[in-house]
From Swiss-Prot:
GO terms for molecular function: NADH dehydrogenase (ubiquinone) activity; ubiquinone binding. It catalyses: a plastoquinone + NADH + (n+1) H(+)(in) = a plastoquinol + NAD(+) + n H(+)(out); a plastoquinone + NADPH + (n+1) H(+)(in) = a plastoquinol + NADP(+) + n H(+)(out). The lineage of its organism: Eukaryota, Viridiplantae, Streptophyta, Embryophyta, Tracheophyta. Its EC number is 7.1.1.-. Keywords: Chloroplast, Membrane, NAD, NADP, Plastid, Plastoquinone, Quinone, Thylakoid, Translocase, Transmembrane, Transmembrane helix. The keyword Calcium does not apply. HAMAP family: NDH1_NuoM (MF_00491). Its main location: plastid. This is NAD(P)H-quinone oxidoreductase chain 4, chloroplastic.
């Protein structure tokens, strides 16, 4: 056990420091913004330091573990720990949240509350990724929903209340299934009930019970991921939310669902996962085609990017369903890769909206000359989203492809069919992404916007865009940096639960 509580500090620090902002005298919006950014940078530095000096990449077991008795009456523990599966998502959370706080500089209305909610969301997400106790995981999962709902309902477009209500109905409704699953999995067995994930991973269940528990967890994680047909909250939410909130949603929140599928469904319920994986493969394949074919019909810029997120999540689901070393590694790389790509695209869409106050693609056009820096960055990131070689998306999707080919679970004809359908989806992806760029930046100039010659990207926006782009190129050139973090954990999961 690690005796210095690194993870407790990392989880508690953002929400604690953010709470001070609410109680200290109001010093103006600028002070609140820089205070929040300093907290995020300090948190990211602490996280990086703790992981660099304490995390051993060749060890698949839980590291930096903390285990404290919390509530004696309920036998409830504060258990935290990280492994190769969670370290990448925690670092991604820190990086994207820091960029999102910097992107939120234009927010002036109730900025104290806005930045506090971002920090509270930060703590909830880190807590979810580092929890080693099932009930603590559920609490952090729910803690993260409250700030998201308030961010959606208070800052955004005209229909923000509708989208926020739809979001909370979907996510809170699915959380009931998560809670039932948590209680069911912890209370089963002749021994005393346990919520410790490491003990639960070594426990076996009757097939019927395992299937019931698996379905409950799957519904909860399918809403967050999202999987079709439980995805309809996503386009509405992204279409109305402030773009800094969209960065957090696309970059981190969607990845929590995929993380839960691996951490709980795959690790704790291996037999049920083996039974359900063909269905997940079908859903993931349909999702790629469905989102890629539906996206061109979206006239709202942010909704079109949201559908591209749904399509990319299909590759993650297919990688998880392949039950192979390359497939699962590719899914984890895609989680990190799309976290950066999705957040960056929403940021650039938001900066464009700040200038022209339009989100309808039909009303845009001819902006390439007036805002060449934004045009260049948007084009490069669109290329990254459509998996251009040299970018992280290409490597992730290629590894997932390889995982399907090497899978021993599926017949050859089934694998060929899945690969062909995925290839069709990859052909459709450039169509809607490039048409989106064409509608925004080419063609005739806008006729409805006064004083068309608005300013281009400033230093803050350029820094944000480049900061998002560098990891995408870095992972595209040297993906082993991310893959090496999780490879031992992936081998451990597959050998212990499927091939052992």
């Amino acid at each position: 056990m690690n005796y210095f509580p690194w993870l407790t500090i990392i989880v508690v620090f953002p929400i604690s420091a953010g709470s001070l902002m609410l109680f200290l005298p109001y010093r103006g919006n600028k002070v609140n913004k820089w205070y929040t950014i300093c907290i995020c940078i300090l948190e990211l530095l602490i996280t990086t330091y703790a992981f660099c000096y304490n995390f051993k990449m060749d060890d698949p077991l839980i590291q930096l573990s903390e285990d404290y008795k919390w509530i004696n009456f309920l036998d409830f523990y504060w258990r935290l720990g990280i492994d190769g599966l969670s370290i990448g998502t925690i670092l991604l959370t820190g990086f994207i949240t820091t960029l999102a706080t910097l992107a939120a500089f234009p927010v002036t209305r109730d900025s104290r509350l806005f930045h506090f909610l971002m920090l509270a969301m930060y703590s909830g997400q880190i807590g979810s990724f580092s929890s080693r106790d099932l009930l603590l995981f559920f609490i952090m999962w729910e803690l993260e929903l409250i700030p998201v709902y308030l961010l959606l309902s208070m800052w955004g477009g005209k229909k923000r209340l509708y989208s926020a209500t739809k979001f909370i109905l979907y996510t809170a409704g699915s959380s009931i299934f998560l809670l039932i699953g948590v209680l069911g999995i912890s209370l089963y067995g002749s021994n005393e009930p346990t919520l410790n994930l490491e003990l639960l991973a070594n426990q076996s269940y009757p097939v019927t019970l395992e299937i019931i528990l698996y379905i409950g967890f799957l519904i909860a994680f399918a809403v967050k991921s999202p999987l079709i047909p439980l995805h309809t909250w996503l386009p509405d939410t992204h279409g109305e939310a402030h773009y800094s909130t969209c960065m957090l949603l696309a970059g981190i929140l969607l990845k929590m669902g995929a993380y839960g599928l691996v951490r709980i469904n795959m690790e704790l319920l291996p037999h049920a996962h083996s039974l359900f994986s063909p269905w997940l493969m079908v859903v993931g394949t349909i999702q790629i085609i469905y989102a890629a074919s539906t996206s061109p019909g979206q006239r709202n810029l942010k909704k079109r990017i949201a559908y591209s997120s749904v399509s990319h999540m299909g590759f993650i689901i297919i990688g998880i369903a392949s039950i192979t070393d390359p497939g699962l590694n590719g899914a984890i790389l895609q989680i990190i890769s799309h976290g950066f790509i999705g957040a960056a695209l929403f940021f650039l869409a938001g900066t464009s909206y700040d200038r022209i106050r339009l989100v309808s693609l039909d009303e845009m056009g001819g902006m390439a000359i007036s805002i060449p820096k934004i045009f260049t960055m948007f084009t490069i990131l669109s290329m990254a989203s459509l998996a251009l070689p040299g970018m992280s998306g290409f490597v992730a999707e290629f590894i997932v492809f390889f995982g399907i080919i090497t899978s021993q679970k599926y017949l050859l004809m089934a694998k060929i069919f899945i690969i062909v359908v995925m290839a069709i989806g990859m052909i459709l992806t450039p169509i809607y992404l490039l048409s989106m760029s064409r509608q925004m930046f080419y063609g005739y100039k806008l006729i409805n916007v006064q004083n068309f010659s608005f300013f281009d990207s400033g230093p803050r926006e350029l820094f944000l865009s480049i900061s998002s782009l560098l990891p995408i190129i870095g992972m595209g050139i040297y993906p082993d940096f991310v893959l090496s973090l999780a490879s031992n954990k992936v081998e451990s999961i597959l050998s212990n639960y499927f091939y052992g």
